[in-house]
């Protein structure tokens, strides 16, 4: 059985790990880095760039470079969070036919799972290169506060990338796994504060040794799926744009390329301010108007930046309070506070966490890698390699159905340990009603419309009867991925209807299949492109070396031979401009054959030179030896025999 890898599919950065010989290992990507920017670029020639190469070209290709796709995954176009992002993102977000938020790049309409699949594919490839074998299975992490649609969409992304997603687990839980197994510090209750690039989660987790088994039980979880490092960057961008407009009278928000440069600079400045008290944002030629080019140079102090994001940090504290209350634990019960996510490197965030929990957060957990490591550990548990770990996670939000009067009746309460199932019997609202619509909801509000609609289905052929008489049993079943399966059964007839919630939005099976095929076709295209580039590089290298050799030794071969080489060179130079791999390889071979005579002459000359040099060295060595002769007398020493 192959390895099950662990992938932290992040908003800003992603990471992949695997357990080898019982130890988790974070795998470096093709560029040699342990984390990969979750950035995807669609370039003009059809190539798709992922990670650092995509980030490098973002300034010149802002409309076709997608970042933070995770903020859109499993979301409706009408969601207020999506509407907010439409104004901030340089790329186009549009409403898909199913009502979801999709992205438009180069006349293609792409679903967020399709875009995220490109990042997952890069993670998969990194793992395959490291392990030297094909990888087909993965554990992928999601924010604990992701709803059902977002979890399902993440699973779809895995499928499109060619991965069987063995389990979706919550990021704070994964971080707790990494921490608990690395430290082995006995029974404890920990708080995991996870402030990533686009999402915030907090989980209260109990770690216990039960009969030699490490048990990780999530007591509660809370969070905000639209609060993260990207929002901190945006505050800094907004401030710089406002100040620049005051000074120069130019609105940088109207210049997409300038905004992209500013985004990169703001992210860099934010990171610098975690270790320095002041930094400078310096962007020459940021834009221009009728008076000429404009340069941006602005000093930002740590205190100023902290004042810009003060309310964002405060927003993360309320979920901590709720999580503690839901877990039924007090601050004094918390042994350790673990920080996860790159944004937790900000000193002000650390201070706020310390102030709330009353203790110094642990600094011995890598905030960028802990989640992927935990996912890899869970992968080793699922593959049977590790048998001493038990993970008990929870559903983050309550689940129920809409009932008479537009209210939500909860069947499963938030923070219930999963997998779990619950059922309740309902009846009809009208006389002689022959069908009921089961409208599935997720959330905490009493009013049905105020909660997240996960989907609906019908149960028909109910025998006519007065209202309140038919007995319809609705069963909710949440699997270990936190994904919901719902069934409804008429107790009188035994007739049943059921669905795996794909949300009223989400991708259909046919769409996923199409995207899987597209991805496979892309992989084939990528392979062909790689082969073409390799052939072209080989041919260009050959052309260069033969031109050089012809210049140095061309006078040593006959005119016919020289003309033959020059003709082959010309043909090869012409063909490398095209995209025909076979033609390039053929002309390179012809050139190599045509220049054989030249090669022989060069080889013979090199041998002659080496021989001459060797002879000279020997003669020189002989002379040196003559001058170093030492006269000595030898005396035989006889040992006395016993």
Curated annotation (Swiss-Prot):
Keywords: ATP-binding, Chaperone, Nucleotide-binding, Phosphoprotein, Stress response. It comes from the Bacteria. This is Chaperone protein DnaK. Belongs to the heat shock protein 70 family. PROSITE patterns: HSP70_1, HSP70_2, HSP70_3. Pfam families: HSP70 (PF00012). The modification Phosphothreonine is found at residue 199. Residues 608-642 are annotated as: Disordered. Acts as a chaperone. GO terms for molecular function: ATP binding; ATP-dependent protein folding chaperone; unfolded protein binding. It comes from Chromobacterium violaceum (strain ATCC 12472 / DSM 30191 / JCM 1249 / CCUG 213 / NBRC 12614 / NCIMB 9131 / NCTC 9757 / MK). PANTHER family: HEAT SHOCK PROTEIN 70KDA. Induction: By stress conditions e.g. heat shock. HAMAP family: DnaK. SUPFAM superfamilies: Actin-like ATPase domain (SSF53067), Heat shock protein 70kD (HSP70), C-terminal subdomain (SSF100934), Heat shock protein 70kD (HSP70), peptide-binding domain (SSF100920). Gene3D superfamilies: 1.20.1270.10, 3.30.420.40, Actin, Chain A, domain 4, Substrate Binding Domain Of DNAk, Chain A, domain 1. Residues 608-619 have a biased composition (Low complexity).
């Amino acid at each position: 059985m192959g390895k099950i890898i662990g992938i932290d599919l992040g908003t800003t950065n992603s990471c992949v790990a695997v357990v080898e010989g019982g130890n988790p290992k974070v795998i470096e990507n093709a560029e040699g880095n342990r984390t990969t920017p979750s950035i995807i670029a669609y370039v003009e020639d059809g190539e798709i760039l992922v990670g650092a190469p995509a980030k490098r070209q973002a300034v010149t290709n802002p409309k076709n470079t997608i970042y933070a796709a995770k903020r859109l995954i499993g979301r409706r176009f009408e969601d207020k969070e999506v509407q907010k992002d439409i104004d901030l993102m340089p790329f186009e977000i549009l409403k898909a036919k199913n009502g979801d938020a999709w992205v438009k790049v180069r006349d293609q309409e792409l679903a967020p799972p399709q875009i995220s699949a490109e990042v997952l594919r890069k993670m998969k490839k990194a793992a395959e290169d490291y392990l030297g074998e094909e990888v087909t299975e993965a554990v992928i992490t999601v924010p604990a506060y992701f709803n059902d649609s977002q979890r399902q969409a993440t699973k779809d992304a895995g499928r499109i990338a060619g991965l069987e997603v063995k389990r979706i687990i919550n990021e704070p839980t994964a971080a707790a796994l990494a921490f608990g197994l690395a430290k082995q510090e006995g029974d404890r209750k920990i708080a995991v504060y996870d402030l990533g690039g686009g999402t915030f989660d907090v989980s209260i987790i109990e770690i216990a040794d039960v009969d030699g088994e490490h048990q990780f039980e999530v007591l509660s979880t809370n969070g905000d799926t639209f609060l993260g490092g990207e929002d901190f960057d945006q505050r800094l961008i907004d401030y710089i744009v406002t100040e620049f407009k005051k000074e120069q009278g130019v609105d940088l928000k109207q210049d997409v390329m300038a905004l992209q440069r500013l985004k990169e600079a703001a992210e860099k400045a934010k990171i610098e301010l975690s270790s320095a008290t002041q930094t400078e944002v310096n962007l020459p030629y940021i834009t221009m108007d009728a008076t000429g080019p404009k340069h941006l140079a602005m000093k930002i102090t740590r205190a100023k930046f902290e004042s810009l994001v003060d309310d964002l940090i405060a927003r993360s504290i309320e979920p901590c309070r709720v999580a503690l209350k839901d877990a039924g634990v007090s601050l004094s019960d918390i042994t350790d506070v673990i920080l996860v996510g790159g944004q937790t490197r900000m000193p002000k965030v650390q201070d706020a966490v310390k102030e709330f929990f009353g203790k110094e957060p642990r600094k011995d957990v890598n905030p960028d890698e802990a989640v992927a490591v935990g996912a890899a550990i869970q992968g080793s548990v699922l593959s049977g390699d590790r048998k001493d770990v038990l993970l008990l996670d929870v559903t983050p939000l309550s689940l129920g159905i809409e009932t008479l009067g537009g209210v939500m009746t909860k069947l499963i309460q938030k923070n219930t340990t999963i997998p779990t199932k619950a059922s309740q019997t309902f009846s009809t609202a009208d006389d002689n009603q022959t069908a009921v619509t089961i409208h599935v909801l997720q959330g905490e509000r009493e009013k049905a419309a105020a909660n997240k609609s996960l989907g609906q289905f019908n149960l028909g052929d109910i025998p006519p009867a007065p209202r309140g008489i038919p007995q319809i049993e609705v069963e909710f079943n949440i699997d270990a991925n936190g994904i919901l399966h719902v069934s409804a059964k008429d107790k009188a007839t035994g007739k049943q209807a059921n669905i795996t919630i794909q949300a009223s939005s989400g991708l259909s099976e046919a769409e996923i299949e199409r995207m899987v095929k597209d991805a496979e076709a892309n992989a084939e295209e990528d392979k062909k492109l790689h082969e073409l580039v390799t052939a072209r590089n080989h041919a260009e290298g050959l052309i260069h070396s033969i031109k050089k050799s012809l210049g140095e030794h061309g006078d040593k071969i006959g005119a016919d031979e020289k003309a033959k080489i020059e003709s082959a060179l010309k043909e090869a130079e012409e063909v490398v401009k095209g995209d025909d791999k076979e033609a390039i390889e053929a002309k390179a071979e012809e050139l190599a054959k045509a220049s054989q005579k030249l090669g022989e002459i060069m080889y013979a000359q090199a041998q002659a030179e080496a021989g001459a040099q060797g002879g000279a060295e020997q003669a020189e060595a002989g002379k040196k030896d003559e001058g170093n002769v030492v006269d000595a007398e030898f005396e035989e020493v006889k040992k006395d025999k016993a």
